[in-house]
Amino acid sequence: MNHAQLFTVLFDVFCPLAAGYFLRRRKWMTMAQCNGMMLFNVVVLITVMNLLSFWILPLQGDLLLLPLLSLLTAFLSAGMMAPLCRHQSFVDQGTLVVAAMLANIGTLAGICGYILYGELSFAYVQLFAVPQNILMVVLAFPLAQYYAARGGSVGGKAPLQFNLRELLFTPKQLGVVGMLIGLGLQLFQVERPGFVTDFFRMLVHIQAWIAFTPVGYTIDFHRAFHYLRQA
């Protein structure tokens, strides 16, 4: 990594984190605005960037290993965490199992991959990240509700319920649609305009700030140290 790439990582990752934390401390941003930024990132920016990056992704069979490995990693991590935290409260169990299952791969790794290796690297990362995005709504959300219900029930018993249609067919899954459109354009050999490369480069920096500013906003060092002492 050269100095320019290192500076870009600092500017696009740590600066928005610090900005979000500062905005919260100064009360210059509300939680509603923070949630709005996160929704805009997931629904609009990720969809457009997936479409543009997958437009130039070479269609190769071995790329199927990326989503398969992503699913394997998520299930192994959650499976290893579940027995380790079984003696804690149901709420803490749910928190740890869901946290072990998911990772901020799509945003952080996507941006770093683009900075280091270019636009194709961003697409490769999204191939790995998309299964985790689907798992988040199909499995992680129901699991979180399940553990929360067990924590509030008598005897710690609660059913695991979810509506697959309501979970999958939401605006938050538009990123997958963008990916499929991009792959379709690649499949039918539609040439991508040259100006898109510069446009994508601009979107990477915008998306970094839109994505990481809310993360910085939600950082709570006091609660983090509390759980660190428990660990």
Regions found by a protein language model. Give the residues of each.
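Alpha-helical transmembrane segments of multi-pass small-molecule/ion transporters
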Residues: M1-A231
